[in-house]
Amino acid sequence: MSFYVFLVLFVFSVFWSFYRHLTKYCTFFLRMCRKVITFAQKFENCAMNDIPSFNSYIVKTIKENWLLDALTDYKGPTLQYHDVARKIEKLHIMMEAAGIQKGDRIAVCGRNSAHWAVAYLATLTYGAVIVPILHEFNGEQIHNIVNHSESRLLFVGDYVANIIDEKEMPHLEGIFNLPDFSLHTCRNERLEDAREHLNLLFGEKYPMAFRAEHINWHIDDPEELCMLNYTSGTTGFSKGVMIPYRALCGNVDFCMMRLGMYLLKFSRMLSILPMAHMYGQAIEFLFPFCSGYHLYFLTRLPSPSLIAEAFKEVKPHLVVAVPLIIEKIIRKRVFPKIQNNAVKLLMQMPVVSKKVKERICQEVYQAFGGEAYEVIVGGAPLNQEIEKFMMDIDFPITVGYGTTECAPLIAYSDYKDFVSGSCGQTVDHMEVKILSNNPSTNSISTKAPT
């Protein structure tokens, strides 16, 4: 009986190995032959110093992908790129009515959503400074950040709207509800009037319909301040990090050149990490949006079951995660299936172990949706046991490193070049120096081009 079980497992593993390699080579062939090339390849001289402005990325992707799906709230509505442009333009009308000037601060605080992304993009393309706030912060922390940043407007999600007190933020002129951009609080009569008659004002400005050629948004300077990002901090209130457009350009440019070559034009990505955090914001939001991909947002607390369900339905072409997410998926969905005597016995057989590992790798691959080019881990070191397991089965995983100040990338390597226990190589546009003769126990300094 055991012989037949072994035979079935062996035949099945051979079949899966053949199927996996056939799919891999077919996909590679299609990528080599496709006429649709990546955004980075189309952007002539796509080095950071040659980019006219960061907002040109946003304008270009909207115009070129006008009728394609852009932002989707998981199990919710979808915005196409032209829908995003219309909403941005309407927010610009209200910002102008409120008297917002270039360089004024606008804060956003809420769970990941399509409208969070729209508020962010509208702020940058207007020329204002975005202040993303982690929705996990309590009311007092949010009040402090809004006041310290001198924000004039605030966009909030449903949960945040219930924990803040507008009286504690006396300089705010308006608070918008993210779900529908309605006014939660308004201290500016012109803003209130503009919101009430928004569709009329939009129709008067664009009587023959709003089209791509009407886009005329703020052209930024590389050294211009675009963001105040308040980190969680280790003591006291959060510390604000001043981020110029140059930093966003460098990160998006690097991702489009290094990752864009492996992702098809109509790729999908799933936004799990907090968008207010620089890691999720740059890699899960700005890079895919500027590349014309379709983004899905988890608008609820990302529990392991919800993440697993979303991976299965969305089937993202690139997975970006923190170690905790990877560890939970492996320990809860993979280890229970393979940590039994039968599999352990097969793993010890020299001839069979390779096929068994390939089958296990395919099982793990399916847990992440089955279509991802690679899984990028960052934010903290990956558990050594999990990393060793992933490397043993040849799973496409890599670990990167960064900080908020660098927006965020400092180091990254493609999974094919990843060395276990490392966090990649220095990314383009960056310089790294170890400030010690004993590099394993000291800090590093980084420098980007000026």
Feature names for model-found ranges:
Residues 23-28, 39, 59, 98, ...:
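Structural core segment of the AMP-binding/adenylate-forming
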Residues 66, 192-230, 237, 262-268:
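Conserved pre-ATP/AMP-binding loop-to-beta segment of ANL
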Residues 80-82, 218, 226-252:
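Conserved AMP-binding A3 loop
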Residues 105, 111-131, 135-139, 147-153, ...:
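A short helix-loop-beta submotif of the ANL/AMP-binding
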Residues 249-268, 275-361, 371, 396:
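Conserved AMP-binding/adenylation subdomain of ANL enzymes
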Residues 356-450:
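Conserved AMP-binding/adenylate-forming
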